[in-house]
Amino acid sequence: MYSSPLCLTQDEFHPFIEALLPHVRAFAYTWFNLQARKRKYFKKHEKRMSKDEERAVKDELLGEKAEVKQKWASRLLAKLRKDIRPECREDFVLAITGKKAPGCVLSNPDQKGKMRRIDCLRQADKVWRLDLVMVILFKGIPLESTDGERLVKAAQCGHPVLCVQPHHIGVAVKELDLYLAYFVRERDAEQSGSPRAGMGSDQEDSKPITLDTTDFQESFVTSGVFSVTELIQVSRTPVVTGTGPNFSLGELQGHMAYDLNPASTGMRRTLPSTSSSGSKRHKSGSMEEDVDTSPGGDYYTSPSSPTSSNRNWTEDMEGGISSPVKKTEMDKSPFNSPSPQDSPRLSSFTQHHRPVIAVHSGIARSPHPSSALHFPTTSILPQTASTYFPHTAIRYPPHLNPQDPLKDLVSLACDPASQQPGPLNGSGQLKMSSHCLSAQMLAPPPPGLPRLALPPATKPTSEGGSSSPTSPSYSTPGTSPANRSFVGLGPRDPTGIYQAQSWYLG
């Protein structure tokens, strides 16, 4: 089992994240972290932050490195992807990127059937409603975690309880908000020296209105540390620029090697690596059970929507935007190998993605910082069984052994039709004449891991007689194939057949 030093990298470059990352506002990072700092300070000191302390925290967060903000946004997008129903994920990406008219995007409900809440930071005790997170993330509106009641769904929204489409979510403006907006507007007009913009009729504009700034300052106290101009400016800045993420490719080189052989329908893959800190945990197949996972958790994909169009958004991406393969997304999908004549740029595209799954920047390099992703008019790859993965040839990196015995056990358990066991750790050869292992050859099972059962396999005799299970034999290393003596382990005990058919996979 391998231990990954950076357990969050293998899910940071999913096509879902690559497409949405340019549309995330950088203000969201500052806002979520500022609220968490204030809450932590209050719990520790039992008093609120002073203005100077809060302003110092704000300046620190605004000056954070771009790569830190992008990694945070990638983790949050991966978490939001799990909270969106599988059939709505593609439509959500198309709506955010402007490729499709906005429609309802349903989220997975909580146990009471209402909008779920998630934490937006690592080890944060403050939770936010999903629709609040969407508005802050993609619109840059400074809402508190208690402002869920201020959100109003649009009239065209057909599922107001669970819809998290940002285009369907508005903020209710109260009379107090309008009253304060008037004074803020007047103050900005006086400071800039420009005439006041029209607030109503021409006759109303001609009347001189005097501001009693002293009375205003005595009546209202600004609780935040953002000025009006600064707030508008930072709320419109995207989290990524035209230069793409500033991740180090060496840093993001994770254990993402998968043997995707187009000739075989069963996908053989290595077991997921676990970090030494134990931040990963085994996942179940239920979407609802994965509530708030660690940033290094496995984010499972979903099949595309049956009501979606034949052409998916991942097939229209530029050649510079690649789709890394996830460990569970292709387990049930056959992989069809496209032909070079299907696309004029297919040959050049596959040359860049043939050797090893490396982590790509994932953002189209564009001179415009806040521009959306550009899509070609023709498809790069033809329609395949899995729309998320255009890669055709993916090999193991040199530091991973493709003949890992654990991988062979997974292949043996999942795909009994194509069993060809490989060498075991390079020191001995396990020659299998059937798909079952006897109990004598198995190592002691590690505790606490999922249990898999293998069906008994029979092999017809050469004389055409009845089929009977055969016993595996062991080959002594260091001898030539012709001189090797095979020692039979003898028939199995019928009473222990279930013990021989099941074992634990590490």
Curated annotation (Swiss-Prot):
The modification N-acetylmethionine is found at M1. The modification Omega-N-methylarginine is found at R365, R451. The gene is NFIC. It comes from Sus scrofa (Pig). The modification Phosphoserine is found at S194, S294, S302, S304, S305, S323, S333, S337, S339, S343, S473, S475, S485. GO terms for cellular component: nucleus. This is Nuclear factor 1 C-type. Its main location: nucleus. InterPro entries: CTF/NFI (IPR000647), CTF/NFI_DNA-bd-dom (IPR020604), CTF/NFI_DNA-bd_CS (IPR019739), CTF/NFI_DNA-bd_N (IPR019548), MAD_homology1_Dwarfin-type (IPR003619).
